[in-house]
């Protein structure tokens, strides 16, 4: 995590001084190759937290993301008034401060006897995925996680286009909608994950949360009022309880020295979803907004995402049923 944080600071420095597209792309490549801060933070949480408390703490990581989702663009816009480079220098300073804090304050999460020696073959995400997928308890959750990630990336992919095309939103209204989502997501992750787990348990939190996501996606697909969509946004963010609960379920299926490997695989699956989802969702969006032979339906990608989430729910419920049917 410290190495990734240090390289993150270097990346922001390169972005600040980049004077051509090639240096900019180099900085982005470096970031992609070393972007392990989030997955290692989750692995660290898994290492130091008893199994029953992991989902709630994973939710707190999600809450931090929600806060950053709101504050990052706002602070970046203010700094950009000083210069285009100022936001990158500020991000470099934050990453550097994070590195210093981690180096001097954060202890190692596992004792030496429980750490696994580095294996280059397991560092390959495909090899790691293959190894984890061979574990019966992880096959179905990993597939559910991937399908869910592809579906939920619809928000990042077409949200701005959807608001502008369907409701004539200005850039300010799009920004407002994103701020509402970020605040709602942070509140949901910080305050709702733990009560949901306590009342429902991890298993029901996952599939009920996914059903909640399906309802939200269908509504976004068919609503014709921009105001109604803005009102719906806080409720769409509540479906965020699914991911920490599902991560906690999967973390119980691996040994203590494989938590980092699991989180790395989940990060790789997220990356795959971030490649596939834009390709599919933008094609569907264009098909239903620019093709005169099709009905005008800007929300079509959300309906596709709802269909994918339905598949994920069916797979997850089938897994739960098969596990409950096993003899004790």
Task: For every predicted segment, state its role.
Residues 107-144, 166:
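Juxtamembrane intracellular "pre-TM" segments in multi-pass secondary transporters
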Residues 17-22, 34, 168, 222-224:
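Helix-breaking motifs and short loop linkers at transmembrane-helix boundaries and internal kinks
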Residues 99-105, 303-328:
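Multi-pass alpha-helical transporter architecture, strongest
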Residues 188-202:
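Helix-to-loop junctions at the C-terminal end of transmembrane segments
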């Amino acid at each position: 995590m410290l190495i990734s944080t240090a390289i993150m600071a270097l990346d922001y420095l390169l972005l600040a001084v980049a004077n051509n597209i090639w240096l900019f792309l180099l900085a982005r490549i470096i970031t992609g190759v070393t972007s392990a801060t989030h997955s290692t933070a989750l692995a660290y949480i898994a290492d130091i937290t008893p199994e029953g408390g992991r989902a709630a703490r994973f939710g707190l990581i999600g809450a931090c993301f929600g806060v950053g989702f709101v504050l990052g663009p706002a602070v970046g816009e203010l700094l950009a008034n000083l210069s285009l480079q100022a936001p990158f220098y500020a991000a470099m300073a934050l990453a550097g401060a994070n590195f210093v804090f981690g180096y001097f304050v954060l202890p190692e999460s596992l004792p030496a006897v429980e750490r696994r020696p580095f294996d280059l073959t397991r560092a390959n995400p495909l090899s790691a995925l293959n190894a984890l997928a061979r574990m019966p308890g992880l096959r179905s959750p990993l597939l559910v996680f991937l399908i869910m990630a592809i579906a939920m990336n619809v928000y990042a992919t077409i949200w701005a286009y959807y608001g502008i095309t369907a409701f004539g939103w200005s850039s300010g209204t799009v920004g407002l909608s994103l701020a509402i989502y970020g605040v709602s997501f942070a509140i949901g992750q910080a305050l709702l994950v733990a009560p949901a787990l306590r009342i429902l348990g991890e298993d029901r939190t996952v599939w009920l949360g996914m059903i909640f996501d399906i309802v939200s996606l269908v509504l976004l697909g068919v609503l014709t009022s921009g105001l109604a969509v803005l009102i719906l946004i806080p409720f769409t963010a509540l479906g965020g309880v699914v991911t920490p609960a599902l991560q906690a379920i999967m973390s119980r299926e691996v040994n203590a020295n494989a938590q980092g490997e699991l989180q790395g695989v989940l990060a790789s699956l997220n990356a795959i979803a971030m490649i596939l989802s834009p390709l599919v969702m933008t094609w569907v969006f264009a098909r239903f907004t620019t093709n005169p032979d099709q009905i005008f339906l800007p929300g079509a990608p959300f309906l596709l995402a709802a269909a994918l989430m339905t598949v994920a729910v069916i797979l997850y419920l089938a897994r739960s049923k098969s596990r409950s049917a096993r003899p004790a």
